[in-house]
Amino acid sequence: MKPRIMMISMKSNLRTMRYIGLLLMFIFCLTAQNMMAQRGKLFNSDNQLSSNLATQVFQDSNGFIWIATRNGLNIYDGYNFMVIRKAYNNCNGLNSNYINCITQDEKGRIVLGTNKSLLILNGKRFCNVPMLDSRNKPINTYVTQVSRLHNGDIAVVTSGYGIMTKKIDANACYTMKGEVENLKYIHKILEDKQERLWIILENGKLLRKEKNGKLVSRIMGTEQLNTQDIRQDNKGNIYLATKNDGVYLLKAGSTAFTKIAGIGNLPIDNIYISRDQRLFIGCDGMGIFVYNPVTGFLQNNP
């Protein structure tokens, strides 16, 4: 892997870490209410969590919360944490403590992206999923995001090798074919309810892969934006976060993004839509803001 690839991804993840500890508290309150009767609680390395450098929180179909960190994998059952780290005898199959992202496939298996591989949990052991480039040669690369698509495939976002896919019964992960194959440095993706794939490049440009495979590079309202994150609510509205120009909204059925005036020009890193459809906004050096799309009210560090 080229050093530039690793540096770009690490820089992006370090920005995320500046507020992710606070975000854990809110996500636990919002996604695990059935497991936690008490008020929100902040977890950190002094209180059960294996590291303060956390990159993703994921709730599986059984309600368990999985937390990816730079020092192992954490599993929370509503009462206690279990920490899984790389073992010297490789008994658990975890080949790195540097875990970036988590999702779950259609069979209920946990899928992890690390700094050098893709792993899948088979029973009680993680197994490596071979990653093959466009020439079908095996690679080891930095996985920045894993996401389950509507057709059941797992989309694997990498830094340097573009988007790859793992089919549900496949034993390997392959480069996504079509026009998107030419994209290499990708920051984040989102598949919307129409099965279109929104792609944020590491340079902040937003693209869209249509269901027929065609790649759209001109998206109205985003021409000059440095985009950071993208989410869709349960009504089909798409929120687009930018680096220094606030949040833009693509209403369901619309063709152009428009700026949400009430949010202003916040320096945004990540956004998250809660179950009650509020927008949680993580900002670089400014903590968390919460935007209510019904009232238009923006709350600072609730």
Give residue ranges: language-model regions:
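Carboxylate-rich, polar loop motifs that coordinate divalent cations or form catalytic acidic clusters
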Residues: 1-302
